[in-house]
């Protein structure tokens, strides 16, 4: 049964006015006037009641009323969670040890969406509480159409140095499903390509153009290998920005900064930044003979997932090359652990002379590939860069030396077509040696530096 506007009570009009006013404030905030089409429905809920929103309440069948009451509650909860997660805050669980010991694996975070301003979803039709895949059934948790362009509404502030930030992994646009928890598609493709062309190439003897051709060959071969072997690598999927894996890192570089790592110390514009209290690196720790007691691991805060006992005989040659050669009376190598340690933990272990024989920082041979994947450098995790971080409106001169650093920003994030031909660089069909960035960029890094 519906009512006329004359029959509506004063209380109904007040509630309706408040609801519409709040909704208009919301539309102004998100700058989306398409939402005005919802106002007649709000008016109907409070005043005219022509749409039978609660038709099931009048059913004579108690089973219908019971089932529909649950359906009604679930739909309301899902809609509420959807909007809260997008515009106010969202719960996340830490998936990796990247920020150990500041944040631990499995920790739950409530992340404010209003600090930097909520991002309007790229894929609005999605299931709340599922990032990209529905549990059990394993299908996509979102519908790819429609897709909205990137837009962020005003928030309370901007990203600052040392802020801990949750973001969608930029290189997660393409994933090989069987490897999505361990590496991105591009790192996997370059790595597989290098494995296929296993012959060592003297990159120092090549020009930048020749080096680029080698990396292009690696990527093409690796990509073909992945696409042609779905049983091994899984289906290859493309994901919109808001459906890529969530990462949590610390901001160590802002737009316009020049970042460099010197002997493990992050430098911004030539000056050392303040290190996080729980900054840690990976080490190999050899004892004088006994195993490290569980009690000591608990006191140090080193979890089972963070430690590896290098007992397999296959490790021996590598350990000896590092100088971890302490042996017991039977000639067997004393126990060696692979551990992430803060400075305090390092000093505690090193000071225990009765238990600890040697501590060696993890060599670069244990490091994986580093950004950019198609640029030959002699950078490593402890000595890296310098790299200038792009800022909106800034123009750079493109050269063979810096193009691999910025081409992903130009192509994947800012939507341009880039080609490198024999006579130069072409962007959107025009030859150029300059590019002006459309967006700000930030450098994120974990406190667990060698695992980030």
Show where each model-derived region lies.
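Extended hydrophobic leader/signal-anchor segments used for secretion and membrane insertion
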Residues: 2-452
């Amino acid at each position: 049964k519906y009512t006329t506007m004359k029959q509506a009570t004063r209380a109904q009009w007040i509630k309706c006015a408040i609801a519409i006013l709040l909704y208009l404030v919301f539309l102004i905030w998100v700058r989306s006037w398409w939402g005005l089409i919802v106002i007649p429905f709000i008016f109907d809920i409070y005043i005219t009641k022509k749409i039978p929103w609660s038709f099931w309440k009048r059913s004579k069948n108690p089973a219908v009323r019971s089932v529909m009451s649950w359906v009604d509650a679930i739909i309301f909860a899902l809609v509420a969670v959807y909007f809260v997660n997008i515009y106010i805050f969202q719960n996340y669980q830490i998936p990796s040890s990247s920020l150990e010991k500041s944040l631990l694996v499995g920790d739950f975070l409530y992340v404010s969406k209003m600090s930097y301003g909520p991002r309007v979803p790229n894929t609005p039709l999605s299931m709340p509480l599922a990032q990209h895949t529905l549990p059990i059934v394993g299908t996509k948790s979102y519908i790819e159409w429609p897709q909205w362009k990137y837009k962020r509404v005003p928030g309370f502030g901007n990203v600052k140095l040392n802020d801990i930030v949750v973001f969608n992994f930029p290189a997660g646009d393409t994933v090989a499903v069987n490897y999505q928890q361990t590496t991105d598609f591009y790192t996997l493709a370059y790595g597989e390509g290098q494995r296929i062309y296993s012959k060592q190439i003297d990159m120092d003897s090549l020009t930048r153009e020749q080096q680029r051709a080698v990396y292009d060959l690696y990527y093409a071969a690796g990509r073909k290998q992945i696409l042609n072997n779905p049983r091994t690598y899984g289906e290859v999927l493309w994901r919109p920005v808001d459906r890529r894996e969530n990462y949590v890192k610390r901001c160590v570089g802002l737009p316009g900064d020049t970042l460099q790592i010197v002997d493990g110390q992050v430098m911004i514009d030539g000056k050392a930044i303040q290190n996080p209290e729980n900054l840690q690196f990976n080490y190999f720790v050899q004892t004088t003979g006994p195993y490290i007691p569980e009690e000591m691991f608990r006191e140090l805060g080193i979890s089972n997932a963070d430690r590896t006992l290098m007992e397999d005989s296959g490790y021996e040659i590598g350990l000896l090359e590092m100088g971890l050669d302490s042996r017991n009376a039977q000639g067997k190598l004393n126990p060696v652990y692979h551990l992430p340690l803060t400075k305090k933990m390092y000093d505690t272990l090193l000071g225990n002379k009765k238990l600890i024989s040697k501590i060696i920082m993890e060599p670069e041979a244990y490091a994986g590939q580093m950004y950019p994947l198609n640029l030959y450098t002699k950078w490593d995790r402890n000595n890296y860069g310098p790299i200038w971080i792009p800022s909106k409106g800034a123009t750079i001169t493109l050269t063979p030396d810096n193009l691999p650093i910025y081409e992903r920003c130009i192509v994947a994030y800012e939507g341009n077509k880039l080609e490198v031909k024999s006579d130069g660089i072409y962007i959107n069909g025009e030859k150029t040696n300059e590019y002006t960035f459309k967006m700000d960029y930030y450098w994120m890094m974990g406190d667990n530096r060698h695992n980030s």
